[in-house]
């Protein structure tokens, strides 16, 4: 006969093989009727009886009634009550009561927006009373600020955060793209090309020079591109926006600070996490192009109207058919795939996190590809009661590939021209330019010219923490940031009319950047008389960077597939450069809280930078901000109030911008060749005069803000208004020719002024919570930019297209404003003939 045995854990004196296996299995066994052993029968009967009892208990359904209240005893209306991991559930009525039929040994999960979810075992009971506790996760959230962390409820400045749950499922390639639209006051511009970095602007463009924010990864300021990071390794991103938050970074805080924190291990058994992501990309709003017949007909009309000869091959344009759509030939569906595996865990005294990742992305333009490999290793070790070590290591290597291409050329290329000739060679216009234009075959250049950039990035730090007492610690951090990238371009020779490339060429460049950082600071955190909470951070920071660059180009290679530099017959160019900069700083921050109602944050930083002359090498950058948590006042209504947290903030601070290059204060020269007698001699030509008096661009910012949490943190609103003024903006001033220098000679001077003012709003709501959850977020930003002074009434024209400039810098206008003639309307040929003179 066949018997189904419920097999749990059995053991006796001679059989212990399953002792360590608590898993429950079902086994199908065949028992011969000849087995008449009394011991066996007794055991079999016991097993069957146990199975019967277990199945009976499992199948027993009971009707359970319950009452759900909050901490004050008020009923919670509409709370979700669900049996375990099933879809069997209900909601509480207007009195907080519910009734549900469940197995006697099941568990119930009770949840409601604004309260912590509770799991309650039934244990055969017929009635339950459940008290839900308010969920203060939003207020207790810890945000990363410069050289430390703070609870969100203690913040006095403008700080926005993006957590791992906001970015983990984003179908994008890097963390910068994942932040788009999630932080108010932050504009993120995606370059669109795989592997290229996004451009981040915080609260508008604050200068005509470099307005990019400072990037800090695991406490280390770096210029590492966000495209080099593995999104799966990022725990959170905190954006410091106003001066009271960024002044701790002094001369580098004017444009805001982006703090990126990577994931860490936690106490518990080792956990393996696998992430896989696949997405496709397509160009949007692709313009409709003329086909061959339409283009030929339109060209014939144009030539006839201009009294020019038309192309005899276009006598009947309809015979040309559709021809070539060069945009369709150039564009494709891009595919992105990324994979990562991490292993994390730890004990009470040591935690670890290790991960590896791979990203492969093909761009929407043919032959454009990007690949990246990542490795992350973080650890924490509590050596003893007073000593702790923390390490972070981020490594990535990537390859960007792609030929030379131009979307504009693809739009201008002729649809009457095929991509390739009948013999398989690349086609190209070969007749008169008036008929065929002057654009090379844009698909041929895409495949024949090769561009490759390989990068290697290594970012690491180790922090030692000495605890003198529970409230006084010393932290020392050493950071190392190394970047290597190698560019390799090859262009073969080809005879494409009307612009042939007569010489093949290969260009290579090697770039190396090394940055060393050493931070030392004390951290004090203590509460006095249970009312006065004081936090102090004070210390120093030293940072040094070295950059080395070497490039060379050789022309005329005999074979296109053998183009090592040694094989080039002609040395076209060779060059290189080296630069250094250093920054030495002293900084301090004071946080004070009285009964969690009145909050104060004051910071000061003094920076000394090698980028400025000895007359103005040092600068001081202070800030102060205040906050009032009105909801903590005794008179503020607590019971049945829709507002559970309300805070007002005000802050003012001074920050700087030193991103002007390394040697702006010294004189610079270019080489030139001049005839002296019968010979040409090399000479130095002055291009920039020295100015040892230039100093940091200075940004003064005032911020007003309000934070509000409603309906048990179901709705969270933040509003900020700001005025940001940039003074002593570094601009280039022309030198009068009466000085003896050429009229192209310039010098840096602190003269420009700019202003940004605006408002920001962030609204986050928790709409549903339980078996199905739904959260939403809305961000809105308004910013107005205006140049107040440029040290000249003459506008500075920038951003050239063809032979014309399209934007300018001018006092009274926004930065990079487009300009042109204002017309009254189109002018017709008839109108011109009527006004002939």
Task: Pin down the residues of each PLM region.
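Short, small/polar-rich motifs associated with maturation and membrane association
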Residues: 2-49, 53-376, 381-396, 459, ...
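Low-complexity intrinsically disordered tracts that form flexible linkers/tails across taxa
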Residues: 400-416, 772, 790-796
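Acidic, proline/serine/threonine- and glycine-rich low-complexity intrinsically disordered segments
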Residues: 826-828
């Amino acid at each position: 006969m066949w018997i189904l045995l419920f097999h749990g854990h059995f053991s006796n004196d001679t059989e212990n093989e399953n002792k360590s296996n608590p898993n429950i299995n079902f086994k199908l066994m065949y028992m011969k009727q000849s087995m008449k052993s009394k011991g066996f029968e007794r055991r079999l009967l016991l097993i069957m009886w146990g199975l019967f009892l277990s199945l009976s208990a499992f199948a027993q359904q009971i009707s359970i009634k319950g009452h759900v209240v909050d901490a004050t005893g008020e009923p919670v209306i509409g709370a979700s009550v669900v049996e375990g991991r099933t879809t069997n559930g209900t909601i509480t009525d207007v009195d907080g009561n519910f009734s549900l039929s469940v197995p006697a040994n099941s568990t119930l999960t009770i949840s409601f927006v604004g309260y912590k979810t509770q799991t309650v075992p039934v244990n055969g009971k017929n009635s339950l009373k459940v008290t839900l506790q308010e969920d203060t996760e939003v207020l207790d959230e810890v945000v990363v600020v410069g050289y430390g962390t703070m609870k969100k409820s203690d913040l006095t400045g403008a700080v926005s955060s993006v957590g791992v749950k906001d970015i983990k499922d984003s179908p994008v390639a890097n963390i910068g793209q994942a932040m788009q639209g999630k932080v108010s006051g932050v504009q993120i511009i995606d370059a669109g090309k795989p592997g290229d970095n996004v451009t981040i602007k915080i609260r508008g463009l604050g200068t005509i020079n470099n307005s990019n924010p400072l990037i800090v990864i695991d406490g280390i300021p770096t210029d590492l591109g966000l495209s080099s990071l593995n999104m799966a390794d990022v725990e959170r991103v905190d954006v410091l926006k106003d001066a009271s938050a960024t002044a701790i970074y002094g001369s580098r805080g004017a444009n805001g600070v982006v703090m990126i924190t990577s994931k860490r291990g936690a106490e518990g058994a080792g956990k393996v996490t696998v992430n896989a992501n696949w997405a496709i990309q397509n160009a949007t709003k692709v313009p409709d192009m003329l086909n061959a017949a339409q283009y030929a007909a339109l060209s014939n009309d144009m030539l006839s109207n201009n009294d020019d000869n038309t192309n005899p091959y276009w006598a009947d344009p309809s015979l040309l058919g559709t021809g070539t759509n060069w945009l369709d030939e150039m564009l494709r569906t891009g595919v992105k795939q990324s994979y990562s595996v991490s292993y994390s865990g730890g004990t009470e005294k040591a935690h670890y996190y290790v991960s590896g990742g791979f990203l492969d992305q093909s761009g929407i333009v043919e032959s454009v590809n990007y690949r990246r490999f990542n490795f992350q290793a973080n650890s924490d070790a509590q050596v003893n009661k007073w000593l702790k070590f923390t390490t972070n290591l981020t490594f990535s290597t990537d390859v960007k590939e792609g030929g030379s291409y131009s979307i504009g050329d693809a739009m201008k290329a002729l649809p009457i021209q095929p991509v390739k000739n009948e013999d398989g060679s690349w086609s190209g216009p070969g007749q008169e330019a008036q008929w065929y234009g002057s654009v090379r075959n844009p698909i041929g250049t895409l495949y024949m010219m090769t561009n490759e950039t390989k990068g290697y990035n290594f970012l690491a730090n180790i922090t030692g923490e000495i605890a003198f007492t529970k409230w006084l610690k010393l932290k020392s951090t050493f950071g190392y940031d190394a970047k290597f990238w190698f560019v390799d371009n090859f262009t073969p020779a080809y005879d494409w009319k009307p612009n042939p490339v007569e010489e093949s060429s290969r260009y290579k460049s090697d770039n190396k950047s090394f940055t060393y950082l050493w931070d030392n600071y004390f951290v004090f955190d203590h509460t006095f008389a249970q009312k006065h909470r004081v936090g102090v951070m004070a210390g120093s920071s030293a940072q040094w960077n070295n950059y080395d660059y070497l490039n060379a180009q050789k022309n005329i290679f005999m074979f296109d597939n053998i183009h090592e530099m040694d094989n080039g017959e002609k040395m076209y160019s060779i060059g290189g450069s080296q630069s250094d900069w250093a920054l030495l700083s002293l900084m301090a921050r004071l946080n004070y809280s009285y009964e969690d109602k009145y909050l104060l944050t004051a910071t000061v930083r003094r920076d000394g930078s090698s980028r400025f002359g000895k007359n103005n090498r040092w600068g001081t950058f202070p800030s102060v901000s205040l906050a009032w948590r009105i909801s903590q006042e005794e008179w503020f209504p607590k019971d049945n109030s829709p507002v559970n947290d309300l805070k007002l903030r005000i802050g003012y601070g001074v920050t700087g911008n030193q991103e002007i290059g390394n040697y702006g204060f010294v004189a610079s020269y270019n080489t030139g060749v001049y005839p002296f007698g019968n010979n040409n001699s090399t000479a130095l030509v002055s291009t920039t005069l020295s100015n040892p008096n230039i100093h940091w661009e200075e940004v003064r910012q005032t911020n007003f803000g309000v934070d509000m949490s409603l309906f048990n943190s179901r709705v969270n609103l933040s509003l900020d208004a700001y005025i940001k003024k940039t003074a002593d903006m570094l601009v280039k001033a022309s030198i009068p020719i009466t000085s003896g220098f050429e009229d192209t000679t310039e010098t840096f001077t602190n003269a420009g002024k700019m202003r940004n003012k605006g408002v920001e709003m962030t609204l986050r709501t928790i709409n549903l919570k339980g078996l199905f959850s739904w959260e939403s977020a809305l961000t809105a930003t308004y910013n107005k930019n205006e140049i107040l002074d440029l040290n000249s009434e003459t506008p500075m024209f920038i951003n050239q297209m063809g032979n014309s400039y399209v934007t300018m810098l001018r006092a009274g206008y926004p930065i990079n404003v487009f300009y042109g003639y204002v017309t009254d309307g189109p002018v017709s040929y008839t109108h011109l003939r009527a006004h002939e003179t």
